[in-house]
Amino acid sequence: MLNYIVWNANPVLIDWGIQVRWYGLMFAIGFMIGYEIVARMFRHEGAPERWLGVLLIWTVAGTIVGARLGHVFFYEWSYYSAHPLEILKVWEGGLASHGGSIGVILGVLMFSLFTSKRSPLWTFDRLVVPIALVGGMIRIGNLMNSEIFGHATDLPWGFMFVRSRQWMEMYPGQAVHPTQIYEALCYFALFALLMWMYWRKNAEKRPGL
């Protein structure tokens, strides 16, 4: 009996001329669910309906631009500096969640400054709930990409990421911790806690909580 899991998932879900990658799909699903969560919060608090659309534009634009530029500058600058037009091909993959986080922060600041005229904390208090969910979805995308794994392990749930060149270079023949799964579970648990705090503990009445 093997004491490890061989992970050979294809990061591309559909390839019909234009690729649909698992990472991008997880990002999109998280966004759609997050939109509905924030919409319910806004209705619950009587916030102007148009705010939701404006916030969506700012956060989507900030996330996509930030995630793309984060990947470009942090991971593949040598390639994209020589092929700058390739930066525009977001549909081919190459997004970094930390870059997306920076983009969201900037988007919220713009929304607060030009639309809501409220403290950015008011908006962040509502966005952190779906962001925790999106974080978990993104880590599932990382799992499908065979990236962001942990150190070597002999535990029975260790993964061998056979599609990963980095794994082959760093841990050839060794199982590693599936840290994507660990993080995803933590994000989903945080999401559940934040949902409970908002809807059951009236956390919306305590800005910055």
What annotation goes with each model-predicted range?
Residues 1-209:
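A feature for loop-to-transmembrane-helix boundaries and adjacent hydrophobic helices
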